[in-house]
Amino acid sequence: MDYNKAALALHSKYPGKIAVQSLAPCKNRDALSTAYTPGVAEPCRKIKANPDDVYTYTMKGRTVAVVTNGTAVLGLGNIGPEAGLPVMEGKCVLFKEFGGVDAVPICLNAKTKEEVIAAVKAIAPTFGGINLEDIRSPECFEIEAELERDLDIPVFHDDQHGTAIIVLAGVLNALKVVGKRIEDIKIVQNGPGAAGTAIIHMLQVAGAKHIIAVDEHGILVPGRPAGLEGHKAKLAEETNPEKISGSLAEAIKGADLFIGTSIAGALTPELAATMAPDAIVFAMANPTPEIMPDLAKTAGIRVIGTGRSDFPNQVNNVLAFPGIFKGALSVRARDINPAMKMAAAQAIAGLIPDDELNEENILPKAFDPRVADAVAAAVAQAARESGVARV
């Protein structure tokens, strides 16, 4: 199928992919006067007297803003807010189709992190949650951190945490397949940008102790000649316990797990062959992964996952974000905290019984109807237990 041609036809048909639907038909004078003035004044008075009533009388409690400034859209780069709108519309479709969550695309003409932060704070009263999307690194870290601190609704950068949650779910199941424990394995993360950094942090929360991060200049280690900036300096302190230096070739020797969020071909078969027996690879560069599955298998890799739907073990964020927001909204959560993210990963992993796990079946499929509800239930429970649920 020619997806480029089909996408142009789909997007131009209506045009766009989403629309506003009225839940209050206005077919007569009474209906009009109830939905709008004068009747609408009464919900306004209720909310003024008790601000939490906004969840009772408006769409806030079931609606998420999908926010971008178009600076890091898919593999297209900094294409701007208008060109990013089809992607944000698509994200809203996935929220609704997979999680039953209403979502609104917000594409900001905002060049700086301060402008993005100010804009999101200004629109936040309308929404029950904020999904940040396709904002370049390192600004994405700072934007999310300030919004999480200052807003009383969940803020979630899916490029970071959605990917990290799915990877952890896959890792937990892959380790069962190969008979290893996360505390014992050597992990190499190649490409510590937004997703890679979040993956490292999720793995650490799950118990990983030996992680080495590698970028285009080599292993992250304090004082390296190529230098370290921003979040990478912090990562260098938090990872690489033996403080080794060098290239990916040095890092990968004897590794049990490789996680790539980098570029096509970064993990050659020759490098993969130096990994430990029964090694696991998540090669998530798109559209061409760091190593193709057939080459990985030839090099001795036991389990391999990619970001592609045409190979087994697809790492697909749609397994996470619809259910995460569905669960967070259901309890009016103030945050999506580490406990909720961990609960989501464990719920996704748990959908595949141990007796069905194998080298090509470590993650549920994107269209598995159980996923969103399982994730939502786990996230809601974790929100209650961690004290961020309002109801």
Feature map (PLM): residue ranges:
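A short, aliphatic-rich alpha-helical micro-motif
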Residues: 124, 182, 251-252, 272-275
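General beta-strand structural signal in soluble alpha/beta enzymes
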Residues: 105, 131-134, 155-158, 189, ...
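Short, acidic/small-residue loops that bind anionic groups at enzyme active sites
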Residues: 150-164, 281-286
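ADP-ribose/adenylate-binding Rossmann-like module
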Residues: 131-134, 257-311
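N-terminal ligand-binding/catalytic initiation module
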Residues: 1-155, 376, 381-382, 386-390
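Adenosine-phosphate binding glycine-rich loop
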Residues: 158-159, 178-180, 283-391
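Glycine-rich phosphate/diphosphate-binding loop of Rossmann-like nucleotide-binding domains
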Residues: 74, 79-99, 157, 161, ...
